[in-house]
Amino acid sequence: AVAGVVNGVLKKDYEGLEINAGYGGTTGPSYDETTASILWGSQSEKSSATVIIDYFNNSTLGADEMGRFGTANQSPYGGMDFRSSRGYPGYFYVDGVKTIDPDCPEDSATASGSCLFDYGPFGLTIPASERVGFIGQFDYKIGDETTAFMEVAMQHNTSEAGGAATPLDEDAGLTVPGTHPDNPFGQDIEIGRYRPVDAGARRWDIESDTLRLVAGLRGTFNDYD
């Protein structure tokens, strides 16, 4: 649906011009919204036209700005620790023995040898988005009991989605060759559950376009509506 247009549609016989704009934001956390709309209508004895243009834009509100709500580890607040075992720097296998990476932070290391990863701060609480909509309604009376009409509606939306770096399991086949200068073991090392944080967080661009066109005749013919 075209954002904010419902009330405008009810003003089908509107005469005149109406312009609205709005802005709101906060600095803690950082977030803002911008809205704008134009409503124009014209009427005559035989015809009418109504045009509505609607705009909405909001910035991203990242989970990293949400304090305790932006972490997967809720244990300090009486909840559960939902951090992922697909960690960074993770763990690896040496001669078949599971070995946690020595750079794993102490509070992320588990007794089973995994290195937990807090994916919470990488989420988007509110993703950035932009919406532009248009509705046009046109009527023309072609007879005493017959009216031609046309309705046009268009909508263009953009947004994004995202999350932490891709979680990889042991079957991803990641290895460090024995010839690698940073491999002190002199043999190929199999990497366990891991996240390629260096590659950055996942982000997807979302875009959609919608068009609706309806035209016809409205009236009475031989006692039929």
Each PLM stretch: what is its role?
Residues A1-A215, F221:
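Surface-exposed beta-strand-turn/loop segments characteristic
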